[in-house]
């Protein structure tokens, strides 16, 4: 799949008592968009048992502690504070940590190993020049038949935007160049414009982000902060 997360998907995840309990309601993610993304990811993974799961750029993960303990969980992150992230790991018992980035081809990450990999709000921070290695490494670590789930922050306005269309094309087609395929048809309607069925960040959430990243104030003032969700298979 490749689409913008919809309100109905978010609400479905909130209505799932197991998901809501695992993420302790609204406690784990105070920000609106992160809350949407966490719940979408957790709704995909809540039934997972006995799987090898790697969070990419997990930092001090909100998802890994909420997963079934019968899974083998890994957290891949440099912990160098990139994107206002942490510089030290609050280590979780029985979770394996690899202090690297996807795209480094870290020897600690075995080939053809993971049933599931996922990232939350990571891909939009990666320079385009590094994306090829990101997808190549993501494909390397996955088992055949494994799934890669990624949620990506993006700003969408009322009118078509050529630069946005190019960025979306890169997100759609680059993984295919490295051996991935989509688990179902791409649903996103093009050109991409904001519609009221999309789950979106609150104005308060974007105001908070303005204090952290003021370079994007103009974009936030005229666009909605939403999330792409994609599911790839090897």
Can you say where each PLM-predicted feature lies in the sequence?
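A short SAM/SAH-binding and catalytic strip from SAM-dependent methyltransferases
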Residues: 115-129
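A short acidic, Gly/Pro-enriched loop at the edge of an enzyme's catalytic core
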Residues: 105-117
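A short glycine-rich, Lys/Arg-flanked "PGG" loop and its adjoining helix->strand segment in the class I
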Residues: 132-144
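Class I SAM-dependent methyltransferase Rossmann-like catalytic core
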Residues: 1-48
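Class I SAM-dependent methyltransferase SAM/SAH-binding core
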Residues: 54-106
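A C-terminal cap/extension of S-adenosyl-L-methionine-dependent methyltransferases
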Residues: 93, 97, 189-234
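Conserved Class I S-adenosyl-L-methionine
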Residues: 159-191
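Conserved beta-strand signature within the Rossmann-like core of class I S-adenosyl-L-methionine
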Residues: 145-153
């Amino acid at each position: 799949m490749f689409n913008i997360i919809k309100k109905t998907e978010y609400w479905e995840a909130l209505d799932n008592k197991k998901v809501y309990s695992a993420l302790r309601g609204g406690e784990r993610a105070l920000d609106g968009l992160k809350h949407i993304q966490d719940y979408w990811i957790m709704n995909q993974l809540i039934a997972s048992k006995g799987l090898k799961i790697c969070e990419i750029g997990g930092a001090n993960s909100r998802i890994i502690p909420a997963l079934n303990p019968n899974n083998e969980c890994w957290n891949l992150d440099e912990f160098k504070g990139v994107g206002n992230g942490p510089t030290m790991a609050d280590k979780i018992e029985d979770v394996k940590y690899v202090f690297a980035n996807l795209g480094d081809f870290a020897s600690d990450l075995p080939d053809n190993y993971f049933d599931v990999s996922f990232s939350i709000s990571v891909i939009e921070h990666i320079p385009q020049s590094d994306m090829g290695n990101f997808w190549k490494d993501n494909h390397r670590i996955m088992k055949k038949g494994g799934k890669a789930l990624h949620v990506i922050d993006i700003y969408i306005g009322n009118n078509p935007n050529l630069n946005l269309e190019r960025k979306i094309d890169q997100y759609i087609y680059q993984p295919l160049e490295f051996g991935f395929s989509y688990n179902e048809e791409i649903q996103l309607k093009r050109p991409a414009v904001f519609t009221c069925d999309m789950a979106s960040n609150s104005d308060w959430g974007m105001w908070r982000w303005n204090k952290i990243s003021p370079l994007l104030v103009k974009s936030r003032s005229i666009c909605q902060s939403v999330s792409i969700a994609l599911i790839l298979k090897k």
